Design a protein with these regions (language model features):
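Pyridoxal 5′-phosphate
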Residues: 1-209
């Protein structure tokens, strides 16, 4: 990774998607190749489902601010990272979004059945971590994916701690959105992140910038 960044800074330095020079085309091919490899690692069916972001927090904010509207209800857990809980509290205060925080046991695990019980008619989103960086608990997100599908509720997974460390297949998770950090298990540079968007779900997101 260091070598690739160094070569870019020394020998290319162009902006992706701008210009038709040989160096610009080479850079575009490199980015396309990275997107394809990221899709392979995450088990996505197409590279177009991968969005490059600033970091995992940025990916999560794109979901929360791009999906939720006044009156929506969100199910999450008390064990989520501040990158989820703080934006949700902000939306609760400014956008009339309501929250249900499912509890966890002494080992840090939530119960998928409790997640299902928290669903209401106005529930728009379930957002949960794949694993905790505090307890190490790897959560039963596949079970929640089935529940979300049954109730036609959008499902987002925070995979900041697992992408690149734990086998991860976004389609098996049944997730509509998966947010990842680029600089942790995926071993990319700081200031990078990924957002997986399931086919068709891009129509549900309002651009945030």
């Amino acid at each position: 990774m260091y070598g690739a960044v160094d070569r870019y800074n020394r020998a290319n330095g162009r902006a992706v998607g701008r210009g038709t020079s040989d160096a610009g085309q080479q850079l575009q091919q490199t980015v396309d190749r990275c997107r394809f490899r990221a899709a392979q690692v995450l088990g996505a069916s197409a590279k177009e489902q991968i969005v490059f972001t600033l970091n995992c927090t940025d990916s999560l904010n794109m979901i929360l601010h791009g999906l939720l509207t006044p009156g929506d209800h969100v199910v999450t857990s008390v064990a989520e990272h501040n990158s989820v809980l703080r934006p949700l509290r902000h939306l609760e205060a400014t956008r009339d979004v309501t929250l249900t925080l499912v509890d966890v046991d002494d080992a840090g695990f939530f119960d998928a059945a409790e997640v299902e019980k928290a669903i209401r008619p106005e529930t728009q989103l379930i957002i949960l971590q794949h694993a905790s960086n505090v307890t190490g608990a790897i959560q039963p997100v596949e079970d929640v994916g089935e529940i979300a599908d049954k109730h036609s509720v959008s499902f987002a997974v925070d995979a900041a701690q697992t992408a690149g460390h734990v086998p991860l297949n976004v389609e098996q998770l049944g997730a509509d959105f998966v947010a990842c950090s680029g600089h942790k298990g995926l071993m990319g540079p700081l200031g990078t992140g990924l957002l997986y968007v399931a086919p068709g779900q891009e129509k549900e997101l309002t651009p945030t910038r």
